[in-house]
């Protein structure tokens, strides 16, 4: 069963919040503008498989929890009308949608967006996400963004713009199928929180953090790469901090061979700790 829902001239689309949607397989939503009540748990139904958006979100300030817990949803399709310029929070937006496999959020302009924490938390079958050309100049929080997305293999971060991003705790925590991550388009400052960011991503072979100016002091290595035993390429050439923490970061992670990009001054101090099978590129 499919449902086509339009926004009439004197009506608001928030009436969907009150629909009993258990028998609807596909939901197509058309309209010009959505009001601010169209948000938390709006689609919290066990029946929907696909949602198509043909409307403007400029009336919303949050999409928090919008698709949370949709147990049968497989795909969500956004058109160019999906405007998130006024959205400040997308926390838990797709969390616990355990059969969701595909989401394309490329080319989104989230100029007021500050948090995407837990956005895909426990989306167990999610395979790939396209974040390319995602513009979020005010984004600060991305903690647990993909936590325990066990089937996630690829995330496209090409031209991902988030210059103020600071909190990345457990961002890819136990993403055991993730093959590679290239975050070279993202530049962070030395106070970025990377606690357990890639913890137990044991399938990951390629990791590029070229422009991460992360400072390792005290206990701030925090198992960033713990359990990433299959890495064969890693660029942490902008990392700074105390040498013992650099050593721990590397030695708790690296397998017997691969390629690593490091600062020359770090290499001179820790070269005896790097496995002999590794090729070193110095910058």
For the regions a language model picked out, list residue spans one by one.
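Negatively charged
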Residues: 1-283
């Amino acid at each position: 069963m499919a449902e086509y829902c339009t926004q009439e001239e004197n009506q608001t689309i928030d009436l969907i919040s009150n629909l009993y949607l258990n028998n609807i397989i596909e939901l197509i939503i058309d309209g010009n503008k959505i009001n601010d009540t169209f948000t938390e748990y709006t689609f919290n139904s066990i029946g929907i498989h696909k949602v198509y958006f043909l409307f403007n979100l400029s009336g919303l300030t949050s999409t928090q929890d919008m698709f949370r817990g949709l147990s049968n949803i497989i795909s969500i399709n956004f058109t160019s009308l999906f405007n998130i310029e006024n959205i400040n929070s997308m926390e838990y937006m797709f969390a616990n949608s355990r059969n969701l496999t595909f989401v394309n959020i490329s080319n989104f302009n989230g100029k007021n967006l500050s948090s995407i924490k837990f956005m895909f938390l426990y989306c167990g079958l999610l395979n790939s996400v396209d974040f390319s050309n995602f513009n979020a100049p005010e984004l600060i929080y991305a903690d647990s963004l993909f936590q325990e997305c066990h089937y996630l293999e690829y995330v496209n971060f090409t031209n991902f713009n988030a210059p103020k991003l600071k909190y990345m705790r457990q961002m890819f925590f136990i993403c055991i199928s993730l093959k590679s991550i290239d975050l070279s388009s993202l530049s962070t400052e030395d106070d970025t929180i990377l606690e357990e960011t890639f913890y137990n991503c044991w399938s990951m072979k390629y990791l590029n953090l070229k422009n991460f100016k992360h400072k390792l002091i005290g206990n701030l290595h925090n198992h960033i790469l713990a359990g990433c035993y299959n890495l064969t390429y890693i660029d942490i050439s902008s990392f700074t901090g105390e040498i013992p923490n650099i050593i721990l970061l590397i030695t708790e992670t690296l397998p017997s061979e691969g390629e690593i990009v490091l600062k020359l001054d770090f290499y001179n101090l820790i070269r005896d700790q790097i496995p002999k099978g590794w090729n070193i590129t110095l910058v």
